[in-house]
Amino acid sequence: LVVSCGDLSYYYLEYIISSLDIPLYYIRGNHAKSIEYGIAGSRKSPWGAIDLHRKVLRDPKTGLLLAGIEGSLRYNKGIHQYTQSEMWSMVLNLIPSLLWNKVRFGRYLDIFVTHAPPWGIHDQSDVAHQGIKAFNWLIKTFQPAMHIHGHIHVYYPSVVTETIVGNTLVLNTTAIVN
């Protein structure tokens, strides 16, 4: 399966789906538009992709348990920007599904997908790039195997992009690949 952590065009995600012919799960980044326009028409989401925002899902082929939250911390009233309180609300709303996963599958979550990073992990000091405090709590409480995020663009190989928190690998997917 393929996972997108936001700020990629719907047309690009559709290209990946059609080229690889495998499921693509995504969340939107802070730069996502409400509607994208292109030669194939307008759309509110990528055709064939699975939106993870505020959802907990099980991939039928791999059995992986995924959950996601879109956007970043609010800094200019963009449509995919939220306050810390709003992020807390979204995280807390995932709890019933995570508990049900534990009953059904013996684990809460395998992969937590977000655009923004957790607070104090891979984030930056400016408001637009600060991490989300509720994500730290989710990681510590439900211990997914991975938390993958985008948003923090990495231009130098010396920047830390992988961090272990308890049993969770936190991975910045915007890193340079050497």
Regions found by a protein language model. Give the residues of each.
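Active-site neighborhood of phospho(di)ester-bond hydrolases with catalytic His/Asp-centered motifs
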Residues: 2-7, 24-30, 52, 111-115, ...
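Short, well-ordered alpha-helical microsegments
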Residues: 10-14, 155-157
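A short acidic, amphipathic alpha-helical/loop segment
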Residues: 12-19, 39, 134, 138
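Conserved catalytic scaffold of divalent metal-dependent phosphoesterases
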Residues: 15, 28-34, 38-130
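Short, structured coil segments at secondary-structure junctions
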Residues: 19-20, 47, 165-168
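A short, gly/pro- and small-residue-rich
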Residues: 20-29, 130-135
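Binuclear metal-dependent phosphoesterase catalytic core
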Residues: 56-62, 138-142, 155-178
